[in-house]
């Protein structure tokens, strides 16, 4: 007779071994966190897929395309007059500069010389548009870090400049004032004086950002040595604009490959750089560049006051066709380098118009910036890249 099996032995054999720990001995797994596509800290529908180990970011991947509207394909179904209306919409904070790049590419294909009066007016409007763009980020970036006051100052300054832009073009954001061969029409009587007053008024209040934002120890603590982008990463990802210059990359198309009237403004044009490459350096570059753009606007007004009366555009045929061929035009947009690759088959619509938008390249640097940082610093780093989602997705 065999002895009865002990029931406790069967229970023990079925038990699994579990390690229990607390604090540093606790077993942990990485967590995947989705930021967006609808999130208060993003400028539009950007999604970030972040892998976290505790409070540290291990991996970050920007997921783009939620605002893609097929702008490049739409260009192929519009003639050279109509694409100006589409070109200023993907980066709604830099509308004039986007129009400018397209018409410069078409003018280069046509071998067209633009009247001097149009060249200087374009330069003035481009710098005013740059100030409008930068003021938006000078106000919104502190807001993302918890400082609500600067954004009210920024919108007050923007309103003064938007008033003169609206007076000359009829639009507050989408100007549609550029034309192939020049501008839509000459500026109204007395407009230059009103621009000079608006520029002086904005300049007189720019010390608010120096004192209220840069003088705030909490802001400096949240941004100094946070999100450091190396010069090597700038070159690797094709980063441009104030973000690249904050990392010590001394490159600005207005100086290095002048277009419009920038070749004659070398004494006034100042390329602002920093070497730290952190969030604070990027904000400082943006602020100082805004002040320089106000100086450039004054220099343009001084030069325009001594121009002889003349045409503001070229007479064009009823049906405008670019000759067969291809060309590339690029401009120093407020957010960085924008490129326009135009291919023509000799028809009234472009065969292909490829956009190289600054925000698309700049946002790729997040895969380099975010790993190793704290989740709490993610918003500070993201906001310091000064991007527009429409400019990424096109």
Curated annotation (Swiss-Prot):
Principal location class: membrane
Recorded topology in the membrane: Peripheral membrane protein
Top enzyme category: translocase
EC number of this enzyme: 7.1.1.-
Record InterPro entries: NADH_Q_OxRdtase_suD, NADH_UbQ_OxRdtase_49kDa_CS, NDH1_su_D/H, NiFe-Hase_large
Top-rank lineage group of the source organism: Bacteria
Protein localization: Cell membrane
One GO cellular component term noted in the UniProt record for this chain: plasma membrane
Keyword Membrane: yes
Annotated Pfam families: Complex1_49kDa (PF00346)
Keywords: Cell membrane, Membrane, NAD, Quinone, Translocase, Transport
Family membership noted in the UniProt record: Belongs to the complex I 49 kDa subunit family.
Described purpose of this protein according to its UniProt entry: NDH-1 shuttles electrons from NADH, via FMN and iron-sulfur (Fe-S) centers, to quinones in the respiratory chain. The immediate electron acceptor for the enzyme in this species is believed to be a menaquinone. Couples the redox reaction to proton translocation (for every two electrons transferred, four hydrogen ions are translocated across the cytoplasmic membrane), and thus conserves the redox energy in a proton gradient.
Subunit and partners: NDH-1 is composed of 14 different subunits. Subunits NuoB, C, D, E, F, and G constitute the peripheral sector of the complex.
Name of the protein this chain belongs to: NADH-quinone oxidoreductase subunit D 2
UniProt source species: Streptomyces griseus subsp. griseus (strain JCM 4626 / CBS 651.72 / NBRC 13350 / KCC S-0626 / ISP 5235)
Gene field: nuoD2
